[in-house]
């Protein structure tokens, strides 16, 4: 009994001893942890940690912001001239590129031959038909007649008239000096074609005629076909009666053709009379000028140029000899005659 009670005590003591050991070890760990802790509550400790962390972050931000501000101030101070120089170069480069684009656009506009292609894109057979039609007056004037909108035929007729005028001046024995004859012929033909076309277009605009400048140039240019025929024949066959016949027949037919076309495109009797009368008068008088007055005008121009280039003739004026030498000469002659006797 005593043994059993003693063993139970020992077992109990052993069991409690293990428990005590565990408690002591756990208690020792608890004491160490508590010693490392501050005498503050958990919430106040966390608040202090957060405040400390916020202060450190603000200091780092201030330091981080302070360095770039100093760098920016230094860059602004040291690189101001560099920035201005780059800006100036960029502006100059933009101006140069803009000017280059404008110049290239203008060059392409005026140098591109495709712009003039529609005005000269015509077949030779079409030109031949239009030349024949320019000698046939139209009968229907109740509706606008069609006008060819091309310049190839009129331009060739103007150059043909220049060649005919040169042929007529050379066949008459006119001496060419310094290209005056060529320049006069080109100026006369092109001046009439462009000048009269512009004047007729101006009158047509005032009289409300339905015609454009291109159509006026084409109409008047093809109207020169009759003039070329008359001048070519009369420069080789010099008969004034023959010229007047061709002037009325051939020149009159080409003029009637132009008048009929203008009549079909003009509304009102007064407007028709002004436009068509002016066109007919200028066209017929120009043919008379080329046959009768053109040669005289050119010869007058050549004579004027010759008079400016020829030097003045040398004039010989008799000079009076002094009286003294004549007296001595006469006395010498008389003495020689007396000795010879």
Curated annotation (Swiss-Prot):
Give residue spans on the Cytoplasmic membrane side: 1-146, 207-212, 264-272
What keyword terms does UniProt attach to this protein? Cell membrane, Cytoplasm, Differentiation, Glycoprotein, Golgi apparatus, Membrane, Transmembrane, Transmembrane helix
Source organism's superkingdom? Eukaryota
Per the UniProt topology annotation, the Lumenal ranges are 168-185, 234-242, 294-341
Q: Where found in the cell?
A: Cell membrane; Golgi apparatus, cis-Golgi network membrane; Cytoplasm
Q: How does it sit in the membrane?
A: Multi-pass membrane protein
- Any single Gene Ontology cellular-component annotation: plasma membrane
Task: Report residue spans for region: Disordered.
Answer: 26-46
Q: What does this protein do?
A: Involved in the maintenance of the Golgi structure. May play a role in hematopoiesis.
Q: Which family does it belong to?
A: Belongs to the YIP1 family.
Q: Which PANTHER family match?
A: NATURAL KILLER CELL-SPECIFIC ANTIGEN KLIP1, PROTEIN YIPF3
From the Swiss-Prot or TrEMBL record, give the protein name: Protein YIPF3
Organism of origin is Xenopus laevis
Gene name tied to this protein: yipf3
